[in-house]
Amino acid sequence: MIFLYKIFGKWDPTEVEVKDLGIKRYVSLTPVIVPHSSGKHARQQFNKSEISIVERLANNLMRTETNTGKKQVTLRAVEEAFDIVNKKTKQNPIQVLVDAIANAGPREEVVRLKYGGISVPKAVDTAPQRRVDTALRYISMGTNAAAFKSKRSVAECLATELIGAANRDTKSFSINRKDAKERVAKAAR
């Protein structure tokens, strides 16, 4: 009998399917009980794509000054958010997270080129790893913005942000940010 680890002892990452083939290599679904690698990925430049996507979400949620270094609190909030997502959608919350990342990552961005002292915006395709990083950043920024000075907990805000991003809801902060970035890139073509 082969025993597979489940994230938080509840959610099986092996049954999750990454539908966006561009980011499949950068979304790690390794089975771990507790998504906490103690920064082992920091030794090499692009090694962050080897750690669990749930841990990367928790690390991004620790961005604000009040949450810095409080990984256990953040992991508890992520676990509660996953329970809320499971109750509302009746799906594996890791699948909802992967769909949210695929939908919230911008496909096109703008860079500034200098032609004779004049800066000209130019639309470029976004690298897959940057798409995943940007999507995680937008999801965590939306969660922190919704929970700040609010009666709702971080777990509730994270659950609504994940569900909204997975459904491509324009009320979601991450989808709104992605659309704005792609709109600017479309204008700069």
UniProtKB/Swiss-Prot annotation:
Identify the Pfam families for this entry.
Ribosomal_S7 (PF00177)
Q: Which GO terms describe its cellular component?
A: cytosolic small ribosomal subunit; ribosome
Molecular function (Gene Ontology), one example: rRNA binding
Q: How does it assemble?
A: Part of the 30S ribosomal subunit.
Protein keywords: Ribonucleoprotein, Ribosomal protein, RNA-binding, rRNA-binding
Q: What does this protein do?
A: One of the primary rRNA binding proteins, it binds directly to 16S rRNA where it nucleates assembly of the head domain of the 30S subunit. Is located at the subunit interface close to the decoding center.
Protein name, per record: Small ribosomal subunit protein uS7
Task: Write out the GO biological process terms.
Answer: ribosomal small subunit assembly; translation
Its gene name is rps7
| Family listed | Belongs to the universal ribosomal protein uS7 family.
What domain of life?
Archaea
Coiled coil location: none
